[in-house]
Regions:
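Membrane-interface interhelical linkers
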Residues: 1-30, 52, 62-89, 134-143, ...
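C-terminal-most transmembrane helix of multi-pass membrane proteins
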Residues: 2-17, 57-60, 68, 157, ...
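Juxtamembrane helix-loop-helix junctions in multi-pass membrane proteins
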Residues: 33-64, 109-112, 181-209, 223, ...
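Specific transmembrane alpha-helical segments of multi-pass solute transporters/efflux pumps
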Residues: 34, 38-41, 67-117, 153-154, ...
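Hydrophobic/aromatic residues within transmembrane alpha-helices
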Residues: 45, 54, 58, 104, ...
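Specific alpha-helical transmembrane segments that line the substrate/conduction pathway
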Residues: 53-64, 93-94, 102-140, 178, ...
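Helix-helix packing/entry segments at the starts of transmembrane helices
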Residues: 55-57, 113-119, 188-211, 241-281
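Hydrophobic transmembrane alpha-helices of multi-pass small-molecule transport proteins
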Residues: 66, 88, 94, 119, ...
Length: 314
């Protein structure tokens, strides 16, 4: 969701924003909880719908929901605004993200996969330092990057020991690659004309462009598509489509239009925490001391990277 977060955050904030209150905290925690559960639901849905076909179908359904939302709110999705080619690029990168995260979750636990997926904010901070004027690495961001790197190394040490297999290590690395492409999508949004269009159109580009690419990839890798559609598989798929892509996104945009964006974005560190808890409670995935410590380091890193700068008062 980091690319949607950034797309919405980049819009000019309205004046008269409210300070963070209980309603904001409930909405923010709800959004982060839904994103944390997303990878768990994707892994469950993988049991009945193969990963790339699932991603393609989800993006088609989500695109229809976003189109209906934009029509209802009077948001132009097809106006000529110079965003076509950057939109194509963001859609391609979005597809690459799913081409790694889906198969990665087949090979590794959801609680570990989300840890590597959430390296995206750190790749963004690093890339922005070199690509985006005025978005340099501060001391706090560097500390955050180092904390996250230490967390990843600690997590990988599990795989390099007796508890890992070549397949599970490959799954971890696939999820790390997904985090890289997630970050690349965000950087394209920040560095091009996509920065100035509505977040709804940004998301629409990603969904519409990626869907046929993912379907072609599913055919190329000879995926079966729909294996079986039990109630758990169907509800998991609908959760990732309706709740995560559509409802949580709409709530997030409302929060960014109502409260200061810098304070809202700090809450994203909760995402991987909820994911590890959900993986343990719902899927019975083990939480080793290394994974727990790695989670805390990555969450701390996300907090430091997104923490608003303190302003000197005169």
């Amino acid at each position: 969701m980091q690319d949607k977060i950034d797309a919405a955050t980049n819009r000019t904030a309205p004046s008269g924003l409210r300070p963070i209150d209980l309603l904001a905290v409930v909405g923010l925690v709800g959004c982060c909880m839904s994103w944390g559960l997303n990878q768990v639901a994707m892994k469950v849905a993988n049991d009945g719908i193969t990963p790339l076909f699932q991603a393609s179908a989800r993006n088609v359904m989500a695109a229809l929901l976003i189109w209906g939302w934009a029509w209802w709110r009077g948001i132009a999705l097809f106006a000529s605004d110079g965003s076509f080619w950057p939109g194509m690029a963001s859609g391609l990168l979005f597809a690459l993200n799913f081409m790694f995260i889906g198969p990665g979750l087949v090979l590794t636990e959801a609680s570990r996969g989300v840890l590597f997926l959430y390296t995206a904010p750190f790749f963004v901070a690093l890339g922005a330092h070199f690509l985006l004027p005025g978005d340099r690495l501060s001391l706090l961001k560097v500390i955050g990057l180092l904390a996250a790197f230490a967390g990843l190394m600690l997590s990988l040490s599990d795989r390099l020991g007796a508890g890992g297999t070549p397949a599970s290590l490959r799954g971890d690395l696939y999820c790390l690659a997904a985090g890289f492409f997630w970050a690349a999508t965000t950087l394209v949004i920040r560095a091009t004309t996509l920065r100035w269009i509505s977040p709804e159109k940004n998301l629409f580009y990603e969904l519409v462009v990626s869907a046929p690419i993912l379907l072609a990839a599913a055919w190329f890798y000879d995926e079966q598509g729909i294996v079986h559609l039990g109630p758990v598989v169907v509800w998991s798929f609908l959760y990732t489509t309706v709740v995560v892509v559509f409802i949580s996104y709409a709530v997030w945009v409302w929060l960014l239009n109502t409260y200061p964006a810098s304070q809202v974005s700090v809450f994203t560190f909760l995402g991987p925490i909820f994911a590890v808890i959900a993986g343990h409670l719902l899927l019975g995935e083990p939480v080793t001391w290394r994974l727990g410590a790695a989670l805390l380091l990555v969450a701390l890193g996300i907090y430091l990277v997104n923490r608003p700068r303190s302003r000197v008062r005169h």
